[in-house]
A protein has these predicted regions:
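Functional-site microenvironments in short loops/helix caps that host divalent-cation chemistry
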Residues: 33, 37-43, 81, 85-221
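Cysteine-rich, disulfide-stabilized extracellular repeat modules
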Residues: 11, 23, 28, 49, ...
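Short glycine-aromatic motifs
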Residues: 2-4, 24, 119
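N-terminal pre-domain segments of enzymes
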Residues: 1-17
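Alpha-helical interaction segments
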Residues: 4-6, 60-64, 97, 142
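Generic detector of low-complexity/intrinsically disordered segments
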Residues: 2-3, 57, 123
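A short glycine-rich, aromatic-capped structural motif
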Residues: 14-82, 99-102, 188-189, 196
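Compositionally biased, intrinsically disordered low-complexity segments
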Residues: 7, 56-58, 213, 218
């Protein structure tokens, strides 16, 4: 996630701050209903109650998940201590895996230093707002999911109209599936992504803003 100047006038603009930096997409300010309704299939209790959240300023989010190519360049230049494994699935344009929350934060700080722009992890609210891209369904592409839409555990069906699909059991290169309405790829599937927030089971009962809770236990989201 990168801060966008307040005078930005073209939400959706795609840019890259440096040849080694991720390609970014501007996301406009707005508001949305965060969380999932109580009757949504396969939801977790911590996804509710739904509540309206305002995103007060535009920001930018990576067009794709950070790739091994991008993270390996960071490793060569900054040496964070260890080189994350690719689980023998390949590196290159696949999303980087086996990185901790702290690794991700250090990478963002390095990007900030090298590019002169502010990078950080998105809050959970910013991430969900960007993922939904104006939709209210379980997925930004509708009520169900298939392996033609995302790389996920396709050996189970989702929703009334869902079907058993392909389960690839490994990551694939980024950008292999259709983007959402904001031009972001792989917002569902392929890898889990880190957010700035700490995990808190009853967070939705306590908080209703965009700012991260930095008190609870660290957990991927």
């Amino acid at each position: 996630r990168r801060k966008v100047e307040e005078d930005a006038t073209s939400p959706g603009r795609v840019f890259r701050d440096a040849p080694f930096a991720p390609e970014m997409v501007e996301i406009p300010a707005g508001d949305f209903l965060m969380g999932s309704p109580g009757d949504e299939k396969r939801r977790y209790r911590v996804e509710g109650p739904q509540h309206r959240v305002a995103i007060p300023a535009p920001f930018a989010l990576g067009k794709y998940a950070v790739t091994f190519d991008e993270f390996d360049h960071f490793f060569r230049e900054a040496g964070p201590g260890y080189c994350p494994s690719g689980n023998k699935w390949g590196r290159g344009n696949r999303p980087v895996i086996n990185v901790s929350w702290n690794d991700a934060v250090v990478y963002c700080r390095w990007l900030s230093k090298e590019t002169g722009h502010d990078y950080r992890l998105p809050t959970e609210a910013e991430w969900e707002y960007a993922c939904r891209a104006g939709t209210t369904t379980p997925f930004h592409f509708g009520k169900t999911i298939s392996s033609q839409q995302a790389n996920y555990g396709g050996d189970f069906s989702y929703g009334r109209d869902g079907h058993i699909s392909e389960c690839r059991e490994k990551t694939v290169e980024v950008g292999q599936f259709p983007a959402n309405a904001l031009g972001l790829y792989d917002m569902h599937g392929n890898v889990w992504e880190w957010c700035a927030d700490c995990f808190e089971k009853d967070a939705y009962n306590k908080h209703a803003d965009v700012y991260p809770n930095m008190v609870g236990d660290m957990e991927s989201s």
